[in-house]
């Protein structure tokens, strides 16, 4: 069965194992998520569990949103997402970090940091041209394509806005779970800025 939870990225730190091994970890705070709706094939066409995370003031919610969360007897939520392949939950139930344990392999999804308008070298990793005085080609994108089409093809790698994309990093290991603080420590780095929304769920391609 799939495990999943929504949380916020706190930042990075480091821990040491009993043998003295140094491990860089990302700290993710995941307060209990509330199940707002259980979707079924009969009513919705597919099976999923809708969860809410991070309370917000009622004045910021409209009537439909208030009525939706009232069924779960909880406050309006800032973030609402769905998880599939999670069974045995009812509306109003809570998902906490206690469902995970050290050694679990998970996929982590977040929104990458925005870098603004960037050139092809930083955005796509292209090589630069010669930097000597005789060269007229330094950091430009280069050839736009052959003469025959008389146009630039779609998806040509050019300069543009970089970052701000949905990114999933697969097969990360949970190093430690601290239930009393609603904190999960994940080995390595995860996408997103501090305080950004992070989705943690069981790895799809984990080795069995």
Curated annotation (Swiss-Prot):
Gene Ontology cellular component annotations, sorted alphabetically: cytosolic large ribosomal subunit
Region annotated Disordered sits at 116-148
The molecular function GO annotations come to: rRNA binding; structural constituent of ribosome
Instruction: List, alphabetically, the Gene3D superfamilies matched.
Output: 3.30.160.810, Translation factors (2.40.30.10)
Q: One of this protein's GO BP terms?
A: translation
Give a single Pfam family match: Ribosomal_L3
Going by the UniProt record, its keywords in alphabetical order are: Ribonucleoprotein, Ribosomal protein, RNA-binding, rRNA-binding
Which HAMAP family does the UniProt entry name for this protein? Ribosomal_uL3_B
Protein's job: One of the primary rRNA binding proteins, it binds directly near the 3'-end of the 23S rRNA, where it nucleates assembly of the 50S subunit.
- What does the sequence similarity comment in the record state about its family? Belongs to the universal ribosomal protein uL3 family.
Q: How does it assemble?
A: Part of the 50S ribosomal subunit. Forms a cluster with proteins L14 and L19.
Protein name (record): Large ribosomal subunit protein uL3
């Amino acid at each position: 069965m799939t495990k999943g939870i929504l949380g916020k990225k706190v930042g990075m730190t480091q821990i040491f194992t009993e043998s003295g091994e140094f491990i860089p970890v990302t700290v993710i705070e995941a307060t209990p998520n509330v199940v707002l709706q259980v979707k079924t094939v009969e009513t919705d066409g597919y099976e999923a569990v809708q969860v809410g995370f991070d309370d917000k003031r009622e004045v910021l919610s409209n009537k439909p949103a208030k009525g939706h969360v009232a069924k779960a007897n909880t406050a309006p939520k800032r973030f609402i997402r769905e998880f599939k392949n999670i069974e045995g939950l009812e509306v109003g139930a809570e998902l906490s970090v206690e469902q995970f344990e050290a050694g679990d392999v998970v996929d982590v999804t977040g929104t990458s940091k925005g870098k603004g308008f960037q050139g092809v070298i930083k955005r796509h990793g292209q090589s630069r041209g010669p930097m000597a005085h005789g060269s007229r080609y330094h950091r430009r994108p280069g050839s736009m394509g052959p003469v025959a089409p008389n146009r630039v093809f779609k998806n040509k790698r050019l300069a543009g806005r970089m970052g701000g994309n949905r990114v999933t990093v697969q097969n990360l290991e949970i190093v430690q779970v601290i239930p009393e603080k609603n904190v999960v420590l994940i080995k390595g780095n995860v996408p997103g800025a501090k305080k950004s929304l992070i989705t943690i769920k069981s790895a799809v391609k984990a080795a069995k």
